[in-house]
Amino acid sequence: MLDGRPDSPPITIALAKGALLPEAIQCLQQVGIDFSRFLDPGNRLLRIESPTRLNGQRYEALLVRTHDVPVYVEYGQAQLGIVGYDVLRERYAGTEARVAHLLDLQFGHCRMSVALPQDSPYHSAAQLPAHARVASKFVGCAREYFDRLDLPVELISLYGSVELAPLTGMADAIVDLVATGRTLRENGLIERDCLFESTARLIAHPISYRVNQQPIRELITQIRERWLGSLLVGG
């Protein structure tokens, strides 16, 4: 209870397990919200509340699989989420997004690209023959891209290392996330075309954003000033 008033319920943020988590937690720590317990190797909790508040507002976090972040936000179980733009593009490929995009957080830089074998006779996606086989974990993004090229291809959905598909002859090309390109090179592939750049984004449930507009706007302001401002100074 603050100033004799009952506490408002916490605002829930869905955070993605994996590569984005440390910087997502660091970003929120910069504005006074602490979910660092998720980084404790002994932690088994998937839902925690920050021991600190931002302007009196309580915050809690859900730790979920990367592709589940927009789902939790879309269905209102989390008011906010931090997730890669690539995940949003894949989730809403060919449809209207059902979450609000609030802020580019400027970390988790990578790109969605087409890669071909080094010995391929083709030097771009547009040169691939009709009905070429393309492997990807992001078939929605891949389909949108090849539709724009007006090139019919057979899309193969994979969940593991898509670099294996051309090596085994299963696919002529892949569409995948690329950061440094090292994994591609080590597996005899060359990045040929970039579909789009991706960074971590702050998203919101549209109705929850309107209901919690003041605290969420305060959060956005603090992230801009303390997190994005520090990146500009450091950069």
Swiss-Prot record:
E.C. designation(s): 2.4.2.17
Reactions that this protein is recorded to catalyse: 1-(5-phospho-beta-D-ribosyl)-ATP + diphosphate = 5-phospho-alpha-D-ribose 1-diphosphate + ATP
GO cellular component, one term: cytoplasm
Gene Ontology MF terms: ATP binding; ATP phosphoribosyltransferase activity
Localization (cell): Cytoplasm
Transmembrane segments: none
CDD domains for this protein: PBP2_HisGs
Predominant location: cytoplasm
Entry keyword set: Amino-acid biosynthesis, ATP-binding, Cytoplasm, Glycosyltransferase, Histidine biosynthesis, Nucleotide-binding, Transferase
Biochemical pathway: Amino-acid biosynthesis; L-histidine biosynthesis; L-histidine from 5-phospho-alpha-D-ribose 1-diphosphate: step 1/9
Subunit structure: Heteromultimer composed of HisG and HisZ subunits.
Free-text comment on this protein's domains from its UniProt entry: Lacks the C-terminal regulatory region which is replaced by HisZ.
Function: Catalyzes the condensation of ATP and 5-phosphoribose 1-diphosphate to form N'-(5'-phosphoribosyl)-ATP (PR-ATP). Has a crucial role in the pathway because the rate of histidine biosynthesis seems to be controlled primarily by regulation of HisG enzymatic activity.
Name of the protein in question: ATP phosphoribosyltransferase
Species annotation: Synechococcus sp. (strain JA-2-3B'a(2-13))
